Amino acid sequence: MLQPRSLPALQSALASAGLDGWLLYDFHGLNPVAVGMLELPGMTTRRFFVYIPRSGQPVAITHAIEQGPWLGWPTSWRKEKYSSWRSLESLLAGLVSGKRVAMEYSPGDAVPYLDRVPAGVIEMVRAAGATVVTSADLDSAFYAVWSDDQRASHERASRAVSTIGQEAIRLAGSRADSAAPLTEHALQKWIKERFESGGLETDHGPIVAIGPNAANPHYEPTAESSATINRGDILLVDLWAREKNGVFADQTWMGSLGAPSERDNTIWLAVRDARDAAISLLRERLNARKPVRGGEVDDAARDVITKRGYGEYFIHRTGH
């Protein structure tokens, strides 16, 4: 969150990156980074910009009719008002002309999650005389971070999700030889009930899939279309949940209901080794205090899978 106490670290990062400033923009919640950094109360329905310079105080450009959300803006920081597109563009040019600024923009839409500012707004900022670059590293350092409470909540959710996922596979295995084996949908329902009884919430899912269904990363069983889970099946359980207002934990568990075949073992070892390669790269870089990017970690895992002959089937990304 942008506050006076967080400003020095942010401005130090701007200086290290060779940037003149970070320009936040939002309209009707289009840009979650701007929304999260500012945490304005109430609803905003007009365009606004917030310019965080490498030195000096931040400046907000706000609409004249929408001042309520800005009542908590520090009095030592500037706040300008506009009431027409001409006054907006004039104020913007006064702030960023000749400057190299970061925005929530990803060249070529390389990282869609970061590409939040509309192309027309980028054009407006460039027409104001600024050079626009991506704010990706700033977003990672100052927005996409957890508080201590969020981390603790995530870890609690992660432990619960892990327990429920493994129990689900054991339950399916114990029922596979009975007169009433579970269906994918029945096991999905059981997991949802465990979430609810444990004080967890989810948006949809989980994915419970056997055989060919497990090859569909977004498969979800329904009451009308659901396979029966039998002995000898490979079962996938992909589940995610969080505490109320907490941080999601997302895990995938797979198990063989019975002795796995040689082919099953071969594929499992490839996936395990790919996971270990990714974790090894992370540990190596972090222990050496060297930067590491998600794409590098993905490459480390993907290289193992490809060399084992399964690259064309690795259709999902790594990272969650």
Residue spans of the language-model regions?
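Active-site neighborhoods and metal-handling regions in enzymes and metal-associated proteins
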Residues: 1-319
